[in-house]
Every structure is written in C-alpha cells, then in structure tokens.
Amino acid sequence: MQEILIPLKEKSYKVFLGELPKIELKQKALIISDSIVAGLHLSYLLKRLKALEVRVCVIESGEKYKNFHSLERILNNAFEMQLNRHSLMIALGGGVISDMVGFASSIYFRGIGFINIPTTLLAQVDASVGGKTGINTPYGKNLIGSFYQPKAVYMDLVFLKTLEKREFQAGVAEIIKMAVCFDKNLVETLETKDLKDCLEEVIFQSVNIKAQVVMQDEKEQNIRAGLNYGHTFGHAIEKETDYERFLHGEAIAIGMRMANDLALSLGMLTLKEYERIENLLKKFDLIFHYKITDIQKFYERLFLDKKSENKTIKFILPKGIGAFEIVSHIPKETILKVLEKWH
C-alpha cells in the first residue's frame, strides 16, 4: 500500500494506493454510488466496511445527473438515516459521484466528513483528490460547489479492471493534462512505455503532482489553475453537446487540442512541441471529431468559465512541455480564428 500525505492548513489527509483495506467506523455511514458502479463494486466495499449503521443511496449514472435533483436525493437520505456531524458519507464511483458527495457533505449540517473511493481512472488521478466539489446547472458545468477536502482517499486498481476502454482512455486524458503542464518526465513515460506495464506508477506520479499543486494552492489562486488546461474549451463542448456525446475526459482532450491551437498561434508552443502533444493524444485514441455549429455562441459560452472575470476569458495554455501560463486579454479575433478551425 502506497501513501501520499496531503498536509493542508485546515485539514490533512492521506491518499492510499493499493488493495482496499478493512474500514472500521464507529459512526453511521451513507454510501453514495451510481447505478453502474453499485452493481459492479458495492458488494466489494460492503465486505470491507464496518460501521454503526450503513445505508446506500444509488444515483443514476452519467454527467447529466450531476444536478440539484441528485444532490437533494443524497441529502434526503442523510436526513432519513439521521446522520449527525460525526457521521460520514462515502463516495463510491467516478468523478460525478466524487464531486456530488463532496459537495453534499460540505453543506449537510455545514460540513460532515466524507471518504472518497474512486472507481475510474479519471477519478483516481484527478477528481477524488484536491477538494473541488460541485454540481452542474443549466448555465454550465460545476458552477455551484465548494472547496472541501475528504477525510481519506482509497484507490484500488481492481476497480479499473471493469472499465470500458473508452472510460479508461478518458482518464488518460487527465494524466496527459497534468504531464504537459507540470512534468515533462511523465510526458516521456507516457510516450515511451506501455501504460499497462506502469499503470500504478503513473497513477502515483499523477496523484503526487496534484497533491503538490494543491498543497501550494488549495483554493486555486495561481498554480492550481494549471489543472484546468483544456477545461475552458472542454466545458463549453460538454455544455454544447448536453453532456451526452463525450465523456468528460474526451471533452478535455478536445479542449487541450483547441488550447494547443491557441498556444501555437501565440508562439507559446513550437510546431514540434505541438505535434508531440498531438501524437501523445493519438497514441491513446484521444483524437475526436468535433464541429462547432455556431462559433459566436460557442465563444460567448467561454465566458461562463469560472476563471473568467471582468468580461475577460482566462486561458490555461501550455508553455512548451512541462509548463503552462495563464493568459488573458487575448484579442477576440485570435480566439475566433482558432474556433474557425473547428467549424
């Protein structure tokens, strides 16, 4: 079992990578999962969990269910089983479940503890660590939420064996995101090695990158913004396609390519570096066809990004391999020229 300590000012916790251990709790626990994950992995968790009382809340699977209705269902279950401030919520699932349960636990009784047990690659390397929680709204993705850290995160690679290839590759997109912005050595690992042979090592490296970033910038004031590479465009794509056509990681892969187009036009990437990222995405089947139907509408949607302020879009753009820059005040014509390529 490998461990990563994330020491923060208000709350420190550990990320455990290895076989899920026995979890013994002296308080009540509400497990929240989705309809697919519960069928695959709930019994595995229940065999390892001992608590004063256990209840299970199952939410429909999918990004479009990351909403107020699902949040209300979670909270109603918490009230019905009379959870108190010492009780726990347990998130068993991917990024959607992790985000919703984190948010629910942050607002129930003004905050109770929760444990993350991520079951997808994307959730293991990204969503379950760092304390970003939230739900989607008709106006955009993750626009309502909070920063709220878990009590612990347990990552068991056995969960990944049931992932479809598409789900797995979506998680790789988030690994590439972190590698391009923070660690050129990880980029080289992804380029030269078979991921099957070094999966645990790559997950550990990815979580460690995110842990270091979160330790420096828990509330996303500066360096943590690098974790949003590809997300300004990616979130707009998800909203434009009603969260149904692409998985989150797939939309981020497209968003990274759009960001790369912008970085290339601004001279932040050389053509060689641009092609290197493109080839890495190709290696993991992360090149998708996407066509913007209404460029002006898509452009306006970019302003709904949480990083935007004073009617200015902030873009996270790669600056070579292994570094990034937050760029704002880019002329509208420059952005529209990039979007034209996708029209």
Curated annotation (Swiss-Prot):
What is this protein's gene name?
A: aroB
Q: What does this chain do?
A: Catalyzes the conversion of 3-deoxy-D-arabino-heptulosonate 7-phosphate (DAHP) to dehydroquinate (DHQ).
Q: Establish whether keyword Oxidoreductase is in the entry.
A: no
Under the heading Gene3D superfamilies, the entry gives: 3.40.50.1970, Dehydroquinate synthase-like - alpha domain
Q: Write the protein's name.
A: 3-dehydroquinate synthase
- Pfam short name (any one): DHQS_C
Entry-linked SUPFAM superfamilies: Dehydroquinate synthase-like
Gene Ontology cellular-component annotations: cytoplasm
Task: Indicate the enzyme's highest-level EC class.
Answer: lyase
Any GO molecular function: nucleotide binding
**NCBIfam families found in the cross-reference section:** aroB (TIGR01357)
Task: Give the catalytic activity.
Answer: 7-phospho-2-dehydro-3-deoxy-D-arabino-heptonate = 3-dehydroquinate + phosphate
Q: What does the record's cofactor remark say about binding?
A: Binds 1 divalent metal cation per subunit. Can use either Co(2+) or Zn(2+).
- Which positions bind NAD(+)? 61-66, 95-99, 119-120, 132, 141, 159-162
Which pathway does the record list? Metabolic intermediate biosynthesis; chorismate biosynthesis; chorismate from D-erythrose 4-phosphate and phosphoenolpyruvate: step 2/7
| The enzyme's E.C. designation | 4.2.3.4
Residues reported to bind Zn(2+):
174, 231, 248
Q: Which cofactor does it need?
A: Co(2+); Zn(2+); NAD(+)
